[in-house]
């Protein structure tokens, strides 16, 4: 049987966990085997900018950081389960990738 590998990514952990829990509930209802959600390493993007626009004065900096959280879910690619997964309402800050693996 084919598997579906679902990759979730978001800057908001709560909305990411909500979507992962919805997928878990669908798997339990339809009776398909599922592994995950497996937390992948969080990507931290750091940007340091100079506060002073003209270069004069003391060198003070602003530090900004963006964290991207990721989860990986493997699920059997049952037609009924996949249709329900496609109907999940996904928040704007969560991206989903679904890949079929044989």
From Swiss-Prot:
InterPro entries attached to this UniProt entry: Ribosomal_uS10, Ribosomal_uS10_CS, Ribosomal_uS10_dom, Ribosomal_uS10_dom_sf, Ribosomal_uS10_euk/arc
- Specify whether Ribonucleoprotein is a keyword of the entry: yes
**UniProt keyword list:** Ribonucleoprotein, Ribosomal protein
- One protein family per Pfam: Ribosomal_S10
Tell me which domain of life the UniProt entry assigns to the organism this sequence originates from. Archaea
**What biological-process terms (Gene Ontology) are attached?**
translation
Spell out the GO cellular component terms annotated for this protein, sorted alphabetically and separated by semicolons. small ribosomal subunit
Coiled coil feature spans? none
Q: Name one GO molecular function term.
A: structural constituent of ribosome
Signal peptide location: none
Q: Which family does it belong to?
A: Belongs to the universal ribosomal protein uS10 family.
Q: What does this protein do?
A: Involved in the binding of tRNA to the ribosomes.
How the protein assembles, per its UniProt entry?
A: Part of the 30S ribosomal subunit.
Which PANTHER family does the entry link to? 30S RIBOSOMAL PROTEIN S10 FAMILY MEMBER
According to UniProt, the name of this protein is Small ribosomal subunit protein uS10
Q: Which organism is it from?
A: Pyrococcus horikoshii (strain ATCC 700860 / DSM 12428 / JCM 9974 / NBRC 100139 / OT-3)
Query: Which gene is transcribed and translated to give this protein?
Result: rps10
């Amino acid at each position: 049987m084919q598997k579906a590998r679902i990759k979730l990514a978001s800057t908001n952990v709560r909305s990411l966990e909500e979507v992962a829990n919805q997928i878990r509930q669908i798997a339990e209802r339809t009776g398909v085997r599922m592994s995950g959600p497996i937390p992948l390493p969080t990507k931290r993007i750091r940007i340091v900018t100079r506060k002073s626009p003209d270069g004069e004065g003391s060198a003070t900096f602003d530090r900004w950081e963006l964290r991207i959280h990721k989860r990986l879910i493997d699920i059997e690619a049952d037609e009924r389960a996949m249709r329900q997964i496609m109907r999940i309402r996904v928040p704007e800050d969560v991206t989903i990738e679904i890949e079929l693996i044989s």
